[in-house]
Regions:
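A short acidic Gly-Thr/Ser loop motif
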Residues: 1, 58, 113-114, 132-136, ...
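ATP-binding/phosphotransfer module of carbohydrate and carboxylate kinases, centering on a glycine-rich
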Residues: 1-22, 28-51, 97, 122-123, ...
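Gly/Thr-rich phosphate-binding beta-strand-loop-beta motif of the actin/hexokinase/Hsp70
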Residues: 1-7, 63, 130-143
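Glycine-rich phosphate-binding loop and adjoining helix at the ATP-binding site
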Residues: 6-42, 50, 61-121, 127-129, ...
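Conserved beta-strand elements of beta-rich interaction domains across eukaryotes
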Residues: 17-19, 58-62, 136-138, 144-146, ...
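Active-site nucleophile and cofactor-binding loops and adjacent substrate-binding regions
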Residues: 79-84, 105-114, 130-133, 188-191, ...
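Acidic, glycine-rich loop-and-beta core segments that form the ion-binding/anion-interacting portion
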Residues: 142, 146-189
Length: 350
């Protein structure tokens, strides 16, 4: 291991209703999106200092070189025009030049899972799988001997696009209403962007079957937020947080204990299914690279679900035990907070 210094890093939203901007819609061209990114980079770049830039790009790409990747298609309901099929680094380089940020040189563009693996493995040699369990979902792993060249290679699985998992009617409803029906089916069943929407469709069905008037508001997409699920999952006793959610979010001020319990159960089942499906993808990768699980494996995970959703990390561990039995003792998971950004910096430095 060597040492390197990350000169600067920053997070910024691509859409902010309060500030009145959204760079993720179809009427926004690539130039505006990357111009905004270049503007943000310019604000933290050190004047007069040439800085290599590591860029995490969390969407399916065809990689041609460390700093050359072409977007195949958007996911997570992003629709910015003129980006699909284009070289991401070239778009960023053009935007940096236009913004006169000439001292920042894009050196690496990598998937966020790859960045997470690089960051975690830099400090823990047993890390050979990395995953994002947050707004979106994807996993990569270290192939010990890739058939293309016989050398170790990080493989981006794009596991969010796995599509053989049986869907419920609620999954099908969500998928059909999405921007890309039939794509990213697993991601729509496990990721933070969609879990609240799955719960919304379940509650809409519950309201219709029970004749509840509060079901009328559940036609509104994004009505339920991830923090609502977190509060309900952590709720205990008489379920006061669930009662507050029903009153404030859905306008249901008179809820029986049975109804509150049903809502809590629905949220718990959606979260548990997510964690177990994620664990199943981990188990598949593990058994591919080490069929008998003869050595130690560490899975590095970044993302809000793993970090913040109550019980989610434990659910993944339970899912691994269910899939691998006693051999799961060879596997552990760790939080790699901001791993994707740190990993991009490492990729730019080496």
């Amino acid at each position: 291991q060597g040492s390197c210094t990350i000169q600067a890093r920053n997070r910024f939203a691509l859409k902010d209703a309060a500030a009145g901007y959204d760079y993720t819609t179809a009427d926004v061209p690539a130039e505006k999106l990357f111009g905004y990114i270049a503007q943000q980079i310019g604000q933290i770049a050190q004047p007069g200092v040439v800085s290599p830039l590591g860029h995490t790009f969390s969407f399916p790409c065809q990689q041609f070189a460390l700093n050359r990747a072409q977007l195949i298609h958007w996911t997570k309901e992003i629709k910015t025009s003129g980006v699909e099929g284009q070289d991401i680094s070239a778009l960023l380089e053009a935007a940096l030049a236009k913004a006169n940020v000439t001292n920042v040189r894009p050196q690496a563009v990598i998937n966020d899972t790859v960045g997470t693996l690089l960051a975690a493995a830099y400090g823990q040699p047993d890390v050979d799988i990395a995953s994002i369990c947050g707004t979106g979902h994807n996993t990569c792993y270290l192939e010990p001997k890739h058939p293309l060249n016989g050398q170790p290679m990080i493989v981006n699985m794009e596991s969010g696009n796995f599509d053989e998992v049986p869907q419920t009617k609620h999954d099908r409803t969500l998928d059909e209403a999405s921007d890309r029906p039939g794509f990213q089916k697993l991601e729509k069943m496990v990721s933070g962007y969609y879990l609240a929407e799955v719960v919304r469709t379940i509650l809409a069905d519950l309201a219709e079957q029970g004749g509840y008037a509060w079901g009328a508001c559940l036609t509104q997409r994004q009505l339920i937020q991830g923090r609502d699920l977190d509060n309900i999952l952590a709720d205990k006793g008489d379920l006061p947080a669930t009662k507050t959610f029903m009153a404030e979010r859905l306008g249901a001020t008179e809820c029986t204990p049975e109804l509150l319990a049903a809502v809590k159960t629905a949220v718990t089942l959606v979260a548990t299914r997510s964690a177990r499906l994620v664990a199943a993808t981990f188990a598949g990768a593990l058994l591919h690279i080490d069929p008998k699980l003869e050595r130690r494996h560490v899975i590095a995970i970044d993302g809000s679900l793993y970090e913040k959703m109550p019980g989610y990390a434990a659910m993944i561990s339970e899912g691994l035990r269910g899939a691998l039995g006693v051999r799961a003792a060879q596997v552990s998971t760790i939080l790699a907070k901001d791993g994707s950004g740190v990993g991009a910096a490492i990729a730019a430095a080496v």
